[in-house]
């Protein structure tokens, strides 16, 4: 059994003053729209991640709807061959979000899954998560010694670097996120090719104004 909550105008709930508390539609109400309470929610039925739910941060007489960006997690597993090619071929972890949007990374978990045969080897190789085209770093250098070269399943938890807070808007807008080897050579070893690296990134997509 279902009940139609919304009327033909896309409005669902209003308060005692008949101001709108909850609504939906294909077009987000314009700035300065009226009759939406502060904190009113708008479900954008044509939206996607980061643009599906909006909240009125303005007033009843002058609305200002802003997207509510939810945190999602993207998991990407790299093969042994991909790990050993990260210097020449960085691996895309999150695709570019679209014009006027940026990816805000909350945390990164790297999981080395040891295949049981032989380890990766490295000398001065480190990893970094960065915005693809601009090369702006999202994290500081992720030390691979004691991590990627282990002969057991190993986990590294990484948080974004504060330096990214000073990035120009053009360096982070509509940019994909990639994992890169910043060392002087490729990671080697694991001749059996049975080690993998699982990259889990928690992130939000925000719309720049």
Q: Across the structure, where does each feature detected by a protein language model lie?
A:
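Extracellular receptor-binding modules and their adjoining Ser/Thr/Gly/Asp/Asn-rich linkers
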Residues: 2-5, 10, 55-57, 72-78, ...
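Surface-exposed loop/edge segments in extracytoplasmic proteins
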Residues: 62-66, 72-77, 135-145
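Terminal beta-strand-rich extracellular "head" domains
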Residues: 119-170
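Exposed beta-sheet edge/beta-hairpin loop segments within beta-rich domains
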Residues: 97, 164-197
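Beta-rich globular "head" domains
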Residues: 37-39, 84-134, 197-208
